[in-house]
Design a protein with these regions (language model features):
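Conserved catalytic core of the tyrosine transesterase superfamily
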Residues: 1-285
Length: 285
């Protein structure tokens, strides 16, 4: 076997730059997650094998080393089991890629893919009740530029049920205010969906927000006129949830996140309270 075929580094490079991007066309967040896993894994393996990273071989990434790495994540880095499982999820994909192009590593691939995910409890999905949603929407100070933008973010989350990543990546050109107002959202796996926008509330707010902006600009910008990140959006929700808790004690026992807001409208629909879903915070859709 040629030395280059046994080295792990060239395979990792092809995996990240060619396989995930060109062959699989995976979502950017998935690509970043796999990359971040290898950023943590390779130095760990290098230390355990007492080898420079660029001299690591495929066989150095043994099932035993991977199990040690997973234990390291939980014990030394204090990662949750869900995070541990997420990191593990990248490795079977890498192993399968190597085995497809290097058949002599099929057995190694099978051993690596046999490492099981750790079972985790499934938490109950939280939701907000109408007064709690009202309190959250009323929290931003709409007398300021930042407050109006933050209100627009919260209203957009409530209207669309979009994920934080989807909100961060939505562009001005994805908004349609004519006919039946809607927004084009790019979700997980590159799936596109269209969501109606409320003509009497969300549309006027977004119209003012994006007036005069280019179609390729992000809808929601930070103070530096850069796109809000998904982390920034989650922080924004947390900040106003903390503020709303002072006004509404019932929120003090709830974890309010973008995911919680995603479940507000389905809760109303399942409960049969359709009138409440059309009248929140003093406005109609």
């Amino acid at each position: 076997m040629k030395v280059d075929e046994a080295l792990l580094g060239p395979w990792v490079r092809r995996f990240l730059l060619e396989h995930l991007v060109l062959e699989r066309n995976l979502a950017r967040n998935t690509q970043r997650s796999y990359r971040d896993t290898l950023v943590l894994l390779l130095p760990f393996v290098s230390t355990q094998c007492n080898k420079p990273i660029d001299r690591l071989r495929i066989d150095d990434l043994s099932p035993a080393i991977v199990r040690q790495f997973l234990a390291h994540l939980e014990q030394a880095r204090h990662c949750a089991v869900a995070t541990r499982n997420q990191r593990l999820g990248a490795l079977p994909t890498l192993a399968r890629f190597i085995a497809l192009h290097s058949p002599q590593h099929v057995a190694w691939c099978g051993e690596l893919r046999a490492i099981p995910l750790k079972k985790t409890p499934t938490p109950a999905v939280g939701y907000l009740e109408k007064p709690e949603m009202e309190a959250l929407l009323q929290a931003p100070n709409q007398q300021t530029v930042q407050g109006r933008r933050d209100y627009a973010v919260l209203l957009f989350l409530y209207n669309t049920g979009a994920r934080a990543t989807e909100v961060a990546e939505v562009q001005v050109g994805a908004l349609s205010f004519h006919g039946s107002p809607s927004v084009r959202l790019l979700g997980k796996g590159g799936k596109v969906r269209y969501c109606p926008l409320w003509a009497t509330t969300t549309v006027p707010v977004l119209t003012r927000l994006v007036a005069g902006r280019r179609a390729d600009e992000a809808v929601f910008l930070n103070r530096s006129h850069q796109p809000l990140t998904r982390f920034g959006i989650r922080t924004l929700v947390k900040r106003y949830a903390d503020k709303a808790r002072h006004q509404l004690p019932s929120l003090r026992t709830k974890s309010v996140t973008t995911h919680t807001i995603r479940h507000y409208l389905p809760f109303l629909t399942m409960s049969g309270n359709l009138s409440a879903s059309t009248d929140v915070a003093g406005f109609h859709r």
